[in-house]
A protein has these predicted regions:
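Active-site-proximal or metal-binding-adjacent scaffold patches in catalytic folds
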Residues: 1-112, 122-172
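Walker B catalytic acidic pair
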Residues: 118
Length: 172
C-alpha cells in the first residue's frame, strides 16, 4: 500500500477524512469523526469555562481555542514510520489508529489519550515534551475525564501498544 492508496471519505456527518483505502476505511472515518467531536467538546468546554480555572491555564486554553478551528484530521499513510503528530500547531492532526503489531484498530479511549496528547502540543507554545507541555497535558486529561470523553488508563500497571509505541506511564 502506498500514499496512492489513501482516499478521502465523507462521514455520515458530511465531513471528509483522508484514510487508507482498505476494508476498514469506514470504521476509521467513524473513529476519526468521534475523536474530532470529542476534542472540540473539550476545547469549547475549556474556553467557555476559562474563568473557572487557575489563571496559569488561560494562555494554553486560548491558544488551543484559537489554533484548533478548521483542523484537518487524517490517518497516517501505510508506508510511514510516524505515529500520531500535529502540523503547524493545529492546522492538521494525523493519527495512527492501527496497531503496528497486528493491524487492528485502536479503541476510542486509547485514541482519545493520543488526541489529548496532540492537542496539548497545539496548546503549548513550547516544542517537545517540556514541563509546561506535561502540565497542559495533565490538565487536559483531567478535564476530559470529568467530561466523560476519556476514561483514565493505568498505563503504569497496564502498558499498551499504540502504533508500535509502548505507553507504559500515565500522565494522570
Amino acid at each position: 500500500m502506498s500514499n496512492q492508496d489513501m482516499i478521502y471519505i465523507k462521514s455520515k456527518e458530511n465531513e471528509y477524512y483522508y484514510v487508507r483505502n482498505d476494508e476498514h476505511k469506514y470504521e476509521v472515518v467513524e473513529l476519526l469523526y468521534n475523536i474530532k467531536k470529542n476534542i472540540f467538546i473539550l476545547r469549547d468546554h475549556l474556553y467557555h469555562n476559562k474563568n473557572r480555572y487557575n489563571i496559569e491555564h488561560h494562555p494554553s486554553i486560548d491558544q488551543l481555542y484559537n489554533n484548533l478551528h478548521n483542523v484537518s484530521i487524517s490517518e497516517t499513510p501505510p508506508n510511514t514510520n510516524n505515529s500520531s503528530y500535529t502540523i503547524n500547531k493545529g492546522q492538521e492532526i494525523v493519527f495512527c489508529v492501527r496497531s503496528k503489531k497486528d493491524g487492528n484498530l485502536h479503541d476510542i479511549n486509547l485514541m482519545m489519550y493520543v488526541a489529548i496528547h496532540e492537542i496539548s502540543h497545539v496548546a503549548c507554545p513550547e516544542l517537545q515534551h517540556t514541563p509546561l507541555f506535561k502540565k497542559i497535558f495533565t490538565f487536559f486529561c483531567d478535564e476530559a475525564i470529568k467530561l466523560n470523553i476519556y476514561t483514565k488508563i493505568d498505563f503504569d500497571n497496564n502498558p499498551q501498544e499504540c502504533c508500535g509505541i509502548n505507553i507504559n506511564n500515565s500522565i494522570v
